[in-house]
Structure formats: structure tokens, C-alpha cells
Amino acid sequence: MAPSHWRVILNGKSTDNMDLREAVGTLRKRGIQLDVRVTWEDGDAERYVGEAVADGVHTVVAAGGDGTLSEVAAALAHHEGDAASLPSLGLVPLGTANDFATAANLPIAPLEALTLIAERVAQPVDLLRIDADHGPHWCANVASGGFGTQVTVETDEGLKKMLGGLAYLITGMSRLGRIDPISARFSGPEFSWEGEFIALGLGNGRQAGGGQALCPEALIDDGLLDVTIVPDLDGEVAATLGTLVIGGKQAALERVAVRARVPWLEIVSQQPLTLNLDGEPETSRHFRIECVPARLRMHLPGECPLLGG
């Protein structure tokens, strides 16, 4: 039997990670044919995934944060064919927030993460397909809008490197009193809501932006999109809620949130609305978000909270 062939797609910011380097060497000694490619600019992940598919690679491993995972997952989803015909997907979490990995209970240590990929059979997982003004996009974890999106977009890269997830909280605190509500209309099967909101979560996964659990019960294998809308509130209440949302305080969110679970959702806004798609901002007045069931196969822990079984 031929050895398993993996392709690791490594975020260029993590090339000095010695733990990953040693883990790759260990997996090679165990008989896995493992190649590494490093991303430096836009389009690299797409190209490397295309090469992996053409080379008949069995597993593509995203080594980086939520953005790297999303890039690699999107690149796989762009290819024709079902999940069984594409390489399986693995994740070595090397980002600042690692929101998907945290919610999925994936190990952070590179050797443990790679060992899990080797030992666990890949499971079918959903992806979100987002159609907007500038063409279709794919999202592996959470699309968010409003207050949390501005915090993620505005958080300084240097601050993230020094302080990790705490950087998002500091940025959120600095925005208190500047929460501008957004007006939009939401519609999906047996769901409709229209009004002004300050935060929005559209979840395949559960959390984004450094620990904001906007969709705390979302599953990545149920074929459904979890929707959380936080309506506009009076100034002081909104500021307090903003702090609690950034800090992951679910009780405050549950008191005011509008929730739904649908296979697809349309959003129409009179003003440009920015959604953060796993770290990548996309602005449009009209979005259609669809949960595409079992689009990929992914290696996940046996007791993964994101799987419904």
C-alpha cells in the first residue's frame, strides 16, 4: 500500500514555528509523504490546493489561523466533484484567535494536531457559500457583521501578535460609544426580520473575532446555517452589551438576540454592509448565504462539539 500523501499549506507568518518543523519531521519518520508549501500573497493557497488536487494528494493541511483554514477550504470547494473525490482537510492551528479550532476542540500543539489527522477518519462537513456583488465566496466558520466585524477589521496586527485574543477585547473597548446600528432585511425559509442591528453572526461554526460565540449551538454537519441578530439598543445598554459580546458573555447575548436556523438566508440593506468572512471583509448591499451540506471531509476529534453525530 502506498504511503499517505499530505500537502501542508503554511501561512507565511508562521515559517519560524520550530514545533511545526519538528512535527513534520516526526510524521515523515512515521511513513507519511508530507510536502510543505508556504503562502506569501493572495492566490497562493488557491494555487497550492489546485496543485495538490492535480497531484492526487490525499490530505491538504491548513497550517495557520481561521483565515488560512478558510482560504484552503474555499480553494477545495471551488473544484468540481463531491467531497469524496477531493483531498480531505486537516488543520494545525497557528493563528491569533484560532476560533474554529477552539470550538472544535482541536489540539493546538502541531504534533498533536498532525497526529489527530493521521488517526481520525475525515468526517463530512458543511461550508457556507456567500453570493454578493463581487461574486461567490466560501466561509468555513462564521460570517459576522456589525460591532464585532469592526473590531476584527480594526484590530492592529502588531497588537494581535503581542497580546493574542486579548487584542480584540482592547479594540472593542476603544470602540464603545461608537456603535453605529445597521438597517437591513433578513429573509429565509419560515424566517423574516427587518430592522436595525448592532451585531450579526451567521454560523457554520460557533465563534469568531477572538472568542465571540455568536452562534453557540451551531453544528458543521447539519446542513443548516445558524443566524444570530443583535438588534439596536439604547446607548448605554448597547455599549455594555458590546463589551460582554466581545468578552464572550453568552447570558447578555441570549437576552436580546434574534435567532434562527435555516438552510439559506438573504440580506438586503439600503447602505453598504460589510460581512467578515472568516477574517476577510466583503461589502455589498445584497447577500445570499447558503449552507452547502457535506461539501468537504475534515479530520476532527472524536468528541468534537461541532458534530451532531
UniProtKB/Swiss-Prot annotation:
Keyword Nucleotide-binding on entry: yes
UniProt entry keywords in alphabetical sequence: ATP-binding, Cytoplasm, Kinase, Lipid biosynthesis, Lipid metabolism, Magnesium, Metal-binding, Nucleotide-binding, Phospholipid biosynthesis, Phospholipid metabolism, Transferase
Catalytic activity, EC: 2.7.1.-
Family under the similarity heading: Belongs to the diacylglycerol/lipid kinase family. YegS lipid kinase subfamily.
Cofactor field: Mg(2+); Ca(2+)
Protein source organism: Xanthomonas euvesicatoria pv. vesicatoria (strain 85-10)
Top-rank taxon, per record: Bacteria
NCBIfam families assigned to the protein according to its UniProt record, in alphabetical order: lip_kinase_YegS (TIGR03702), PRK13054.1 (NF009602), YegS/Rv2252/BmrU family lipid kinase (TIGR00147)
GO molecular function terms attached to this record: ATP binding; lipid kinase activity; magnesium ion binding
Catalytic machinery residues: 280
Protein name: Probable lipid kinase YegS-like
Function: Probably phosphorylates lipids; the in vivo substrate is unknown.
High-level lineage: Bacteria, Pseudomonadati, Pseudomonadota, Gammaproteobacteria, Lysobacterales
Subcellular localization, as worded in the UniProt entry: Cytoplasm
